[in-house]
Structures are given as C-alpha cells and as structure tokens.
C-alpha cells in the first residue's frame, strides 16, 4: 500500500478490504431496495441465491452475487456497523489477502449449505442472501482471536471478545427459533463452523499443513556424527628435547 493510500485510510476506523465489502453490499442492496417490484423480481432471479436458482436453473454464480444482495434494510445497517466496528481489527491482524479469503470461504460455505438444506426440505424459493453468514462468522473469529480483549459494545456495555461472541450466538439462536428460518440457521452455522476451523490453532487447515510438512521434514533428517574433526597426534616431547 502506498503512503498516500495509508494516509487516506489512516483517518478512518474501517480498513480498505472491509470498506470494499461494505460498499459492494450497500450499493447492490440499495439498488434492489429502491427499485420497483418488476425490477426487484429480475434482480432476484439473476443475482439472488435460492435453492431453485442454484440447483434447478443452474445459476451457480448467485452463490457469489447473492452475498452482496440484502433485502432487509435493518440487517443492512447491522452489517455496515459490524464491518465498521469489529471486522477491521481482524483485517489488520490477518492482512487484506487473508481477510478476502475469509470473506469468500465463509460466505460460500454458508450460502451453499443454506441452499442445500432448503433443497432437502423443499423450500426452493427461500433466499440465502446478504452478508449474514460472513458477519456472524467474523464475530466467531473475533471471539476466538481476541477472546480476552476488552470490548465496549456500542460504547456502553463492557465485554470481552469471547463474551461478545457468546452473546451474538445466543441472539442468533433465539432469532432462528423464533422465526423458524431453518435454512438461514444452517447457513449461519456452516459459516461459523468454517470460521472456527480457519481461526483455531488446533483445527486450522493451514497450520495442520505446516505441522505435517515439519513432521515430514524431521522424519527425513539424519543425525550426523558430531565431535571434532581430525586431531593430529600428540607430539612426543621427549623426542624434541635438545
């Protein structure tokens, strides 16, 4: 990142990657929310991830485009708030490239799991859209990485990162049960599980791969005989006496 770019983002709490993700969802969602019913139907048909769109019509690209289409304005505000307050901390810790991988993997896993479950129960037209899977996955990641970090929730409620994670999980469970949004619940759960695997030191695939390579390298190492090199024989002092 150039000096000019660093100066540009230094005055903002949000980081570049989080800002781009927020801008994509905000732009596409506002287009949908401000459009008429006919335009909404067209946008949903070609951009929104549903079991019917993905599995019946073969519009697999909606697994990616649907991530940035949020129908609920309140949920959209929540997404922007989380992207502004908590997600930049993760991006600074990971770096932008790893942050993008986290967004892609958790969003894809969550959306695909939700659509698959919707197909199994016959809810073919239930949308699995928006950044919800990634948002809740980022809360889980924050609770794991910054488990003991003090957090002022909205500047009022003092919590630790782990307590914040448990609070969101409890709220999410109540929401899914109260609304019976089982498809979205599966999507959220799959994304959060992916986040836990990616951020946990015990279950992280990247760390497991590194540990396997280190163990393999150690198995191939041979113990070389140590000690001194060639030692010249001791001088016969009596022989050289004058």
Descriptions of predicted regions:
Residues 122-126, 149-156, 203-216:
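A cytosolic-side transmembrane-helix exit/cap motif
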Residues 1-16, 115, 171-242:
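C-terminal transmembrane module of polytopic alpha-helical membrane proteins
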Residues 124-147, 159-161:
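Membrane-interface micro-motifs in multi-pass membrane enzymes
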Residues 11-128, 179-183, 187:
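N-terminal TM1-TM2 helical hairpin plus the immediately adjacent luminal interfacial "cap"
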Residues 146-168:
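Membrane-helix boundary/juxtamembrane motif in polytopic membrane proteins
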Residues 87, 140-144, 191, 195, ...:
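Hydrophobic transmembrane alpha-helices
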Residues 79, 132-140, 187-191:
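Hydrophobic core segments of transmembrane alpha-helices in multi-pass, intramembrane catalytic enzymes
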């Amino acid at each position: 990142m150039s000096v000019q770019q660093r100066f540009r983002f230094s005055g903002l709490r949000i980081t570049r990657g989080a800002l781009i993700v927020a801008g994509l969802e905000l732009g596409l969602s506002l287009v949908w929310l401000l459009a008429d019913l006919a335009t909404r139907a067209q946008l949903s048909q070609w951009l929104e991830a549903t079991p019917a769109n993905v599995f019946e019509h073969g519009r697999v690209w909606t697994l990616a485009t649907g991530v940035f289409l949020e129908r609920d304005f309140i949920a959209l505000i929540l997404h922007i708030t989380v992207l502004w307050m908590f997600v930049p901390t993760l991006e600074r810790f990971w770096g932008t490239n790893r942050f993008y991988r986290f967004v892609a993997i958790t969003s894809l896993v969550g959306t695909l799991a939700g659509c698959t479950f919707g197909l199994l129960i016959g809810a073919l037209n239930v949308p699995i859209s928006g950044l919800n899977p990634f948002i809740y996955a980022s809360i889980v990641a924050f609770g794991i990485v910054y488990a003991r970090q003090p957090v002022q929730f909205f500047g009022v409620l003092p919590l630790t990162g782990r307590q914040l994670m448990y609070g969101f999980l409890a709220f999410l469970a109540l929401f899914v049960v109260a609304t019976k949004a089982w498809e979205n619940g599966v999507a959220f759960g799959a994304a959060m599980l992916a986040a836990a695997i990616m951020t946990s030191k015990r279950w992280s695939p990247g760390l497991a791969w590194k540990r396997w390579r280190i163990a393999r390298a150690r198995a191939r190492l041979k113990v070389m005989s140590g000690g001194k090199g060639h030692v010249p024989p001791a001088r016969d002092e009596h022989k050289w006496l004058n």
